[in-house]
Swiss-Prot record:
Functional note: Subunit of clathrin-associated adaptor protein complex 1 that plays a role in protein sorting in the late-Golgi/trans-Golgi network (TGN) and/or endosomes. The AP complexes mediate both the recruitment of clathrin to membranes and the recognition of sorting signals within the cytosolic tails of transmembrane cargo molecules.
Disulphide bond pairs: none
Source species of the chain: Pongo abelii (Sumatran orangutan)
Domain of life of the organism encoding this protein: Eukaryota
Keywords noted in UniProt: Coated pit, Cytoplasm, Cytoplasmic vesicle, Golgi apparatus, Membrane, Protein transport, Transport
UniProt protein name: AP-1 complex subunit gamma-1
Complex and partners: Adaptor protein complex 1 (AP-1) is a heterotetramer composed of two large adaptins (gamma-type subunit AP1G1 and beta-type subunit AP1B1), a medium adaptin (mu-type subunit AP1M1 or AP1M2) and a small adaptin (sigma-type subunit AP1S1 or AP1S2 or AP1S3). Interacts (via GAE domain) with RABEP1. Interacts with EPS15. Interacts with SYNRG/gamma-synergin. Interacts (via GAE domain) with AP1AR (via coiled-coil domain). Interacts with CLN3 (via dileucine motif); this interaction facilitates lysosomal targeting.
Length: 822
């Protein structure tokens, strides 16, 4: 049989192929020749054939039929054969294939070989693709080589030990004695791999940092020698001595100094030297400075050192390299919580980054700008952010608008400024704002009694001839309906009043109704506004009746229903119309979970103002309750009665009260309800309907201890209890769900079931997102009727999304305190 072509000739031949089909034909032809050679057990050219096969594998062609030939080369006594055999094993084999176990004995023999290069090949292969079984069998040999005096073998053995620890963490203690002398080595390769091994051990075991903290002075000494040493051609990179080793040492110091005062004190001086002596003109120096900054911010460093670190990040923002600017912004986001005033010094540079062409830098700069907003700089920062909102790409507008809303709500210097700012956002990016922006602005306007005339005049001007920004039109329609009389009377004192007639106001609202840009929701706002004006205007009531009657036959079901109900008010209930359509009272602002929450971005955390989310408006789906009952099993479970989202009449009078309004958890008298502008809708009877709207709960709740009903995977559910004054059989349980992990839990749903002798109602939760780092809680109220005073038992089901996975769990709660049910 003729000798096969050499690898170099094969490469040259393949490169001459003009088409992919021609290349594929050459590969198939050569693979056929290699297979024939393998079948004939040709030992002479096996090494050459496997080398060609590896090249084909690199091109993406199948080469699995050469796996056993690699094992034969490994068993050969020739170094050239072993080299190709081990390379093939690393490329063609992995721990998912049982074939790799066949070479365990060969690797063991080669680890004890007399030639260091053969030992090095075996260490490289084991460190690259060794399975947990192989690591357990060969860990002893690796540990012996870790103690050898040969620096070539020690560095390879250290890296192999890293792989062994990753695969079999319980073998970590085997390598502890060998790590004692590793840092005494002069060879930089051994030092580098030793630091990698120590870092891996500290990250894998929480006990290791305390064991290795005694090495901090030695690490500091090595790092100082690297900084102070002169030019060394062997280790010099762009004028810096071995930057790779410096970075690794800084990372290890960061782990060892975390939460330890003594270690942090020992490394303060060297970190200051690195930060001041490192050259920043080259990217190598910037990499070392970045690691230094991370170490300073992570350990218990001095305040002056932290200021130095943040100033380094500030210099990074001026760098021409986009990657360095992005890294600086990300790092400042992490530090702004602890060093807010220091980061403020770089505010102008951060704001300039909003004008960067790179979208990633823009987003980081926007997030950091919102984190820097406070009561002192709110006007200037909002001016910059509104300019950014006006010119940024569409994908930024929603987040930017939400951030402006939240910052304005928290730090607004005056109500007029607050209203002007939100109206500017709605005018600029109204189509991108969140759904809760409209009700939040309406609530703000309602509560700013002295600004009603000014606001309705501004909104009237804003929508003249432009209905493209639907949220703005909705707010304007609501305000015109509420305060149309102030608009017509021209009572605005803040700016020059405008002369508007009743017909002109109705013309605007009718234009909104017939505009092609108006959504169904916007038309509903406009029709309701026109109806409200029937009690505020005097000369146009007949026109309003005509408009309302026209939409009684609208093809939009929602609009038709509104029009029919309003027509009934004009005809059958005209004596109630003025009372039902009177002006809305001041609304109470409900906030949850504190002023701030943690926003998660790319695995890092930064503070952002809390986004107050309204509770879900609809009832809990019946199918979810039924699914819960199916999973819980048994026939002694009573179903969950869902909460009705609409209001129901109170037994005390004709007011409309929400279900949640029936129960005042603070024990204070219930607030007077708002007059309704729609007819009352009857509700099915509920077990607690007979309770009056008087204060229901007494101070006995203070004596009922709370319990932890569930605690697993970072999610904690706590129950607190209250008892009714008017009906002792009613227990109200308030659940609080908190999340101690680093990522938010989304789409959170809590369900519960009780035995048939009880009745249970779940009210709507405060949110569907459980914030990370215990920065907020979800609250939900459960009402339980226990007429027979039996011991309370409950089964719960939890569903949520976390780290991209859907989670679900069931639990049983039997440890209710006796005071909650006796």
């Amino acid at each position: 049989m003729p000798a096969p072509i050499r690898l170099r000739e094969l490469i040259r031949t393949i490169r001459t192929a003009r088409t992919q089909a021609e290349e594929r034909e050459m590969i198939q032809k050569e693979c056929a020749a290699i297979r024939s050679s393998f079948r004939e057990e040709d030992n002479t050219y096996r090494c050459r054939n496997v080398a060609k096969l590896l090249y084909m594998h690199m091109l993406g062609y199948p080469a699995h039929f050469g796996q056993l030939e690699c094992l034969k080369l490994i068993a050969s006594q020739k170094f050239t054969d072993k080299r190709i055999g081990y390379l093939g094993a690393m490329l063609l084999l992995d721990e998912r294939q049982d074939v790799h176990l066949l070479m365990t004995n060969c690797i063991k023999n080669d680890l004890n070989h007399s030639t260091q290069f053969v030992q090095g090949l075996a260490l490289c292969t084991l460190g690259c693709m060794g399975s947990s079984e192989m690591c357990r069998d060969l860990a002893g040999e690796v540990e012996k080589l870790l103690k050898t005096s040969n620096s070539y073998l020690r560095k390879k053995a250290a890296l192999c030990a890293v792989h062994v620890i990753r695969k079999v963490p319980e073998l970590m203690e085997m390598f502890l004695p060998a790590t004692k002398n590793l840092l005494n080595e002069k060879n930089h390769g051994v030092l580098h791999t030793s630091v990698v091994l120590l870092t891996e051990m500290c990250e894998r075991s929480p006990d290791m940092p305390a064991h290795f903290r005694k090495l901090v002075p030695q690490l500091v000494r090595i790092l100082k020698n690297l900084i102070m040493s002169g030019y060394s051609p062997e280790h010099d990179v762009s004028g810096i001595s071995d930057p790779f080793l410096q970075v690794r040492i800084l990372r290890l110091l960061r782990i060892l100094g975390r939460n330890d005062d003594d270690s942090s004190e020992a490394m303060n001086d060297i970190l200051a030297q690195v930060a001041t002596n490192t050259e920043t003109s080259k990217n190598v120096g910037n990499a070392i400075l970045y690691e230094t900054v991370l170490t300073i911010m992570d350990i218990k460093s001095e305040s002056g050192l932290r200021v130095l670190a943040i100033n380094i990040l500030g210099r990074f923002l001026l760098n021409n390299d986009k990657n360095i600017r992005y890294v600086a912004l990300t790092s400042l986001l992490k530090t702004v919580r602890t060093d807010h005033n220091t980061v403020q010094r770089h505010r102008s540079t951060i704001v300039d980054c909003l004008k960067d062409l790179d979208v990633s830098i823009k987003r980081r700069a926007m997030e950091l700008s919102f984190a820097l907003v406070n009561g002192n700089n709110i006007r200037g920062m909002m001016k910059e952010l509104l300019y950014f909102l006006d010119s940024c790409e569409p994908e930024f507008k929603a987040d930017c608008a939400s951030g402006i809303f939240l910052a304005a709500e928290k730090y607004a210097p005056s109500k007029r400024w607050h209203i002007d700012t939100i109206m500017r956002v709605l005018t600029t990016a109204g189509s991108y704002v969140r759904d809760d922006a409209v009700p939040n602005l309406i609530q703000l306007i309602t509560n700013s009694v002295e600004m009603h005339a000014y606001t309705v005049q501004r909104l009237y001007k804003a929508i003249l001839g432009d209905y493209s920004q639907q949220p703005l039109v909705q707010v304007a329609a609501w305000c015109i309906g509420e305060y149309g009389d102030l608009l017509v009377s021209g009572q605005c004192e803040e700016e020059g009043p405008i002369q508007v007639t009743e017909d002109e106001v109705l013309d605007i609202l009718e234009s909104v109704l017939i505009s092609n840009m108006s959504t169904s929701v916007t038309r509903g706002y406009a029709l309701t506004a026109i109806m409200k004006l029937s009690t505020r205007f005097t000369c146009t009531v007949n026109r309003i009746k005509k408009v309302v009657s026209i939409y009684g036959s609208s093809i939009d079901v929602e609009l038709q229903q509104r029009a029919v109900e309003y027509n009934a008010l004009f005809k059958k209930y005209d004596h109630m119309r003025s009372a039902l359509l009177e002006r809305m009272p001041v609304m109470e602002k409900v906030t949850t979970n504190g002023p701030t929450e943690i926003v998660q971005t790319n695995g890092e955390t930064e503070p952002a103002p809390l986004e107050t989310k309204p509770p879900p408006s609809g009832p809990q789906p019946t199918s979810q309750a039924n699914d819960l009952l199916d999973l819980l099993g048994g026939n002694d479970i009573t179903p969950v009665i869902p909460t009705a989202p609409t209001s129901k009449p109170s037994s005390a009078g004709g007011e409309l009260l929400d279900l949640l309004g029936d129960i005042n958890l603070t024990g204070a008298p219930a607030a007077a309800p708002a007059p309704a502008s729609v007819p009352q809708i009857s509700q099915p009877p509920f077990l607690l309907d007979g309770l009056s709207s008087q204060p229901l709960f007494n101070d006995i709740a203070a004596g009922i201890p709370s319990i932890t009903a569930y605690s697993k995977n970072g999610l904690k559910i706590e129950f607190t209890f209250e008892r009714s004054n008017t009906n002792p059989s009613v227990t109200v349980i308030t659940i609080q769900a908190s999340n101690s992990t680093e990522l938010d839990m989304t789409d959170f749903v809590f369900q519960a079931a009780v035995p048939k002798t009880f009745q249970l109602q779940l009210l709507s939760p405060s949110s569907s997102i459980v914030p990370a780092f215990n920065t907020g809680t979800i609250t939900q109220v459960i009402k339980v009727l226990n007429p027979q005073k039996q011991q309370l038992r409950m089964r719960i089901k939890l569903t949520y999304n976390h780290k991209g996975s859907a989670m679900q769990d069931l639990a049983e709660v039997n440890n209710f305190p006796p005071q909650s049910w006796q």
